[in-house]
Amino acid sequence: MHKVELKEVGLDIGLAFAKHFYKTDYLHYGYWTKGLTVEPANVFEAQENYANFLLEHFPKGVTSVLDVGCGSGKFAEKMLDAGFKVDCVSPSPNLTKHVKARIGNRSEIFECRYEDLSTNKSYDLILCSESFQYLLLEKAMDKTQSILNDKGHLLICDFFQRNVSGKSPVSGGHKIERFLNYMKTQPFTQIIDKDITRETSPSLDIMRDLIQEVIFPTWNIMAYYMTSNYPRFSRLFSFVFRKKIAQAHRKYFSGGTSGEQFAHFKTYRLFLYQKNN
């Protein structure tokens, strides 16, 4: 049986919230340009900005793309509509259902982790849009080398950990210094390195408001109901899951998940690398 990881559940819940509150199927951050007010009504526009930003950085001559960690398949659909040949890697069974419903047989969908991918195909571009943080660096780069065409490209758009003290309320991301040093040892040439932390960090302010105004009050109401009606079960539940509950409070309910905090601990970058012959 497939073991469900917490991050997988989080992405599926995130998609449900995105559809209901923001009328979007994208799962990535928004790209908040100057003049675009940071408010829920503009989330979809910011995410479209992000999607277009990615497309603008596709190198000339690219026709085939592997979308690693394709989320709901929304951006894969956008690439297909733009004329690219696109295949997808989708390790989450729940999200894969959304991908299949969206793009059908227009793409081959590999239902596995990227590191475990087995295929005879090769691609002009490997795209990791907010999926690189979940990959095992060394194994992922070995896989990338093996399935990229000669002089093919790797496009990464994701956040990384800064070398600062303290603990970020937003987990995830490779350490930026380790990543950059490791890539210097790989048969790749860096073409682009763009810091878009300022443009993406406002997405955390949107997330914070949703948590504080909707999710946290709902959590408190449910907790009040359970402790009032099922006190013994509630005490047992609170004891068994005390570490997870404390983690949820620290990460989500403390109010620290803000754009300012994100920008302090993380750096959001777009990297374009070309494979050497």
Can you say where each PLM-predicted feature lies in the sequence?
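N-terminal, positively charged/glycine-rich alpha-helical extensions of SAM-dependent methyltransferases
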Residues: 1-34
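Substrate-binding/catalytic lobe of Class I Rossmann-like enzymes that use SAM or dcSAM, i.e.
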Residues: 167-258
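Class I SAM-dependent methyltransferase SAM/SAH-binding core
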Residues: 66-116
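Conserved alpha-helix/loop element of class I SAM-dependent methyltransferases that forms part
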Residues: 44-61
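A short glycine-rich, Lys/Arg-flanked "PGG" loop and its adjoining helix->strand segment in the class I
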Residues: 139-153
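A short acidic, Gly/Pro-enriched loop at the edge of an enzyme's catalytic core
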Residues: 116-126
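A short SAM/SAH-binding and catalytic strip from SAM-dependent methyltransferases
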Residues: 125-138
